[in-house]
């Protein structure tokens, strides 16, 4: 499978390249930046010397379709919605890691403050939460966001089991700094984030409508969630702590069964006996989930952790590619956590 990557200079693009270079059925044939830039990848990123010496090329949709079989967009929001149009019209497979094709146009415009993709382009894409979306044979996949992936994987089993009250769902999500992207900003300067804890976009994060939209697939009565996001001074990782009230008390064994039944055939979701931590998943495509129930308050706390650049971005994109094309789901994705 010949692959082109657009958006190679960002964190997710570089992680995507790293994974695909080790994929047994993928050949990366071209690298592109969303802005004009022509230089060997190993010149910009010396860690690639002797590993990948492909030249970063200007974007040309026709040239990509001539040389590749599938294109990944690992671009900032607002880019892929325009650049993907030629591929959609040609029926050429696209996996978009940005938020450009996850939401209906009017909702995208409200939350991203950008003009949306043309309606026929947006409607061509299917939302690719790998564990709950059948993408076999699809051509256009909108890869989920990092916060959204962690939150949805934590909550969907409970919604499927009709186990929780829908008017009390609180998500406190924290991300490492790569989640803020590569473009420099005062909010991600070292002196601002080092030895600090910064809450941002309270009630305004663009993943909120994405999460609600997907949770409604499993219970249409759900209307809203309370969602907060914070930056923590780490390179990688998402920790989503999710609070909900049970409709009726459940034992730990009953709660574990809800999650085990949902994920028993899902290789990248692990249900842990203890509350998980980031060292268990950083550098991998795993999401680890743990929980604890307080019978005094009737509040269930679920903790989901993942690597925002892998399961929250590039890894899930490759997982979707595998499922789309009928490859083994785990191809290229069985790296182990470094742990320390």
Curated annotation (Swiss-Prot):
Gene3D superfamilies with a match to the protein in the record: Dihydrodipicolinate Reductase, domain 2, NAD(P)-binding Rossmann-like Domain
Domain of life: Bacteria
Pfam families cross-referenced by the UniProt entry: Semialdhyde_dh, Semialdhyde_dhC_1
GO cellular component, one term: cytoplasm
One GO biological process term: L-arginine biosynthetic process
Places the protein is found: Cytoplasm
EC number(s) given by UniProt: 1.2.1.38
Annotated function: Catalyzes the NADPH-dependent reduction of N-acetyl-5-glutamyl phosphate to yield N-acetyl-L-glutamate 5-semialdehyde.
Family: Belongs to the NAGSA dehydrogenase family. Type 1 subfamily.
Protein's recorded name: N-acetyl-gamma-glutamyl-phosphate reductase
Biological source species: Streptococcus sanguinis (strain SK36)
Lineage: Bacteria, Bacillati, Bacillota, Bacilli, Lactobacillales
Gene encoding the protein: argC
């Amino acid at each position: 499978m010949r692959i082109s990557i657009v958006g190679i200079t960002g964190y997710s693009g570089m992680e995507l390249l790293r994974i695909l270079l080790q994929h047994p059925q993928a050949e990366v044939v071209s690298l592109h930046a969303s802005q004009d830039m022509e230089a060997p990848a190993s010149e910009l990123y010396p860690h690639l010397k002797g590993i990948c010496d492909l030249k970063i090329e200007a974007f040309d949709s026709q040239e990509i379709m001539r040389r590749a079989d599938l294109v990944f967009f690992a671009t900032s929001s607002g880019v892929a919605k325009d650049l993907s149009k030629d591929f959609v019209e040609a029926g050429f497979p696209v996996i978009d890691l940005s938020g450009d094709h996850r939401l209906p146009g009017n909702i995208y415009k409200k939350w991203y403050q950008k003009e949306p993709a043309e309606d026929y382009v947006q409607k061509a894409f299917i939302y690719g939460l790998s564990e709950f979306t059948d993408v076999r044979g699809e051509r256009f996949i909108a890869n989920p966001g990092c916060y959204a992936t962690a939150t949805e994987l934590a909550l969907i089993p409970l919604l499927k089991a009709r186990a929780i009250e829908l008017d009390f769902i609180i998500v406190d999500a924290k991300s490492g700094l790569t989640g803020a992207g590569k473009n420099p900003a005062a909010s991600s300067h070292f002196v601002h984030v080092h030895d600090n804890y910064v809450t941002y976009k309270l009630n305004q994060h663009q993943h909120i409508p994405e999460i609600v939209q997907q949770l409604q697939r499993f219970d249409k009565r759900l209307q809203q969630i309370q969602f907060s996001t914070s930056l923590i001074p780490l390179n990688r990782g998402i920790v989503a702590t999710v609070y909900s009230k049970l409709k009726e008390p459940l034992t730990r064994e009953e709660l574990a069964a809800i999650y085990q039944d949902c994920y028993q055939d899902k290789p990248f979701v692990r249900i842990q006996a203890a509350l998980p931590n980031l060292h268990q998943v950083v550098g991998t495509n795993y999401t680890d989930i743990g929980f604890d129930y307080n019978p005094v308050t009737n509040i269930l706390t679920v903790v989901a952790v993942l690597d925002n650049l892998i399961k929250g971005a590039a890894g899930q994109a490759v997982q979707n590619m595998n499922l789309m094309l009928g490859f083994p789901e785990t191809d290229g994705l069985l790296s182990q956590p470094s742990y320390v």
